């Protein structure tokens, strides 16, 4: 049995907390919202996972120290925009040598750091966290399916494979198959940037385009992500694997995907703000666009789909005309790097 602290009580955090508790682990969940802690404790329900019953064994707390101290694993499951502030708050209670697992997906716009890098950057400021182990968990994983115990696969990525395997051992069960990977950077880049491509897929569906276009966006979108990722030092296998192509497929095609759904609404004529409001949950693809653009510029990588999404989502470009412009770009070989 492992002792696990979960920071964040959203759909993903609670789906994983339930799964881990049902596997026999001791789970403590913290939320920054006191009223959310009270509601979860009282109802044993997560409002966005209406069919899921929260096990009585899961403990909820309003004190972040209680979720961080004396834990085998601390799980960061908060929206990307809050990762740094929560890491800063938690730092005083996280011991050196701790295993930290991040399941949020994103890139910090101001620093262009991945989220495990953001946590490390914050913890390293006091000079007391030089031996913390950082693991990125990512893959084709809708919280709604994990909450229903449907078969799911995910990647545990850490340079230290002994740590990656320890996390694999804790998270793996008959419904969750966990693979290890040593390419934490590549896995995190896939998780963040695929959300932008999923927006593109949704926009095209909203415009009434078909499966041909969606397939093209998935393949060419991953080509863009891979071009950037390889220049940044990621490993090619990561982009072709579960955290790369696997996650992109599910995010760009599923009706459960917030990014796909937000894109669909934008394709139907809604503004980005209207789409986010209607989806009702964080749309990480919109948050990831500025960092994606900066990284493309910094590493001199051509990412036309990402730039097209930015034009439609943030600059008021006509979606149909933007697709036409993509289709009429200069002729190229598919093998162009």
From Swiss-Prot:
Keywords: Cytoplasm, Lipid biosynthesis, Lipid metabolism, NAD, NADP, Nucleotide-binding, Oxidoreductase, Phospholipid biosynthesis, Phospholipid metabolism. One of its GO terms (biological process) is phospholipid biosynthetic process. The keyword Lipid metabolism applies. The active site is at residue 194. InterPro entries: 6-PGluconate_DH-like_C_sf (IPR008927), 6PGD_dom2 (IPR013328), G3P_DH_NAD-dep (IPR006168), G3P_DH_NAD-dep_C (IPR006109), G3P_DH_NAD-dep_N (IPR011128), NAD(P)-bd_dom_sf (IPR036291). Its EC number is 1.1.1.94. GO terms for cellular component: cytosol. NADPH binds at residues 11-12, 105, 143, 258, 282, 284. Pfam families: NAD_Gly3P_dh_C, NAD_Gly3P_dh_N. It catalyses: sn-glycerol 3-phosphate + NAD(+) = dihydroxyacetone phosphate + NADH + H(+); sn-glycerol 3-phosphate + NADP(+) = dihydroxyacetone phosphate + NADPH + H(+). One of its GO terms (molecular function) is NAD binding. The keyword Cell membrane does not apply. It is found in: Cytoplasm. Its main location: cytoplasm. Sn-glycerol 3-phosphate binds at residues 105, 139, 141, 194, 247, 257-259. It is an enzyme of class 1 (oxidoreductase). Gene3D superfamilies: N-(1-d-carboxylethyl)-l-norvaline Dehydrogenase, domain 2, NAD(P)-binding Rossmann-like Domain. SUPFAM superfamilies: 6-phosphogluconate dehydrogenase C-terminal domain-like, NAD(P)-binding Rossmann-fold domains. Pathway: Membrane lipid metabolism; glycerophospholipid metabolism. Catalyzes the reduction of the glycolytic intermediate dihydroxyacetone phosphate (DHAP) to sn-glycerol 3-phosphate (G3P), the key precursor for phospholipid synthesis. Belongs to the NAD-dependent glycerol-3-phosphate dehydrogenase family. NCBIfam families: PRK00094.1-2 (NF000940), PRK00094.1-4 (NF000942). This is Glycerol-3-phosphate dehydrogenase [NAD(P)+] 2. It comes from Lactobacillus delbrueckii subsp. bulgaricus (strain ATCC 11842 / DSM 20081 / BCRC 10696 / JCM 1002 / NBRC 13953 / NCIMB 11778 / NCTC 12712 / WDCM 00102 / Lb 14). The gene is gpsA2.
